[in-house]
Amino acid sequence: MLHGEAIEALIVGGGAVAARKARALLIAGARVRLIAVEVGTEVRELAGAYPKLHFEERSYASSDIGNAQLVLASTNDRGINRRVADDAHAAHRLVNVADDPARGNCRTTATHRAGDLVIGITAGGVPSAAVRIRDSLAARFDDRYAAAVATLASLRRRLIDGGASDEWARASEALIDDRFCERVEQGTMESEAAQWG
């Protein structure tokens, strides 16, 4: 997974797939430039909500790669997607190709977020399967897990910053064992973690 706030991304395409990929990058904090002959309503709405999204309605040019670290080819034209991928490879950039994942050198994930817990799913180039799996996992890994992760992160910081890294090692071994999910789902993680802090 990428730390979005440090990423400048280029998306070529303006439809639903491009909008979905843009949304994920924007939520992660990336700066996104989108080029498309025609930009759909979803992209326009995203641009209104996220100042880090800039779009241009025009044809793609090889020079659009520019300083982008991540390039996403998301048009409904295989030829354009192939050209975008070739240009990105020539510029030594990470590239994702929506209609031909093997042509790219990275994949995007169907992502579920609950606080600082982030679960990313890929499914061999079958995005609808990844989405179905993500939705199934999201039903279980909810705000209870977000709270547990926040509690553990706070405990870890407190112990390590206080010079007690050995104590953190023992605490994490005790709290993040085979009963971790059981503790979270029964609501006992916070009280058990408090015994270590």
Feature map (PLM): residue ranges:
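Short beta-strand and adjoining strand-loop segment in the mid-core
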Residues: G29-R33, A68-R78, D116-G125, A139
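Hydrophobic beta-strand scaffold residues
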Residues: V32, F55, L94-V95
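Glycine-rich, highly charged phosphate/nucleotide-binding loops
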Residues: A47-G66
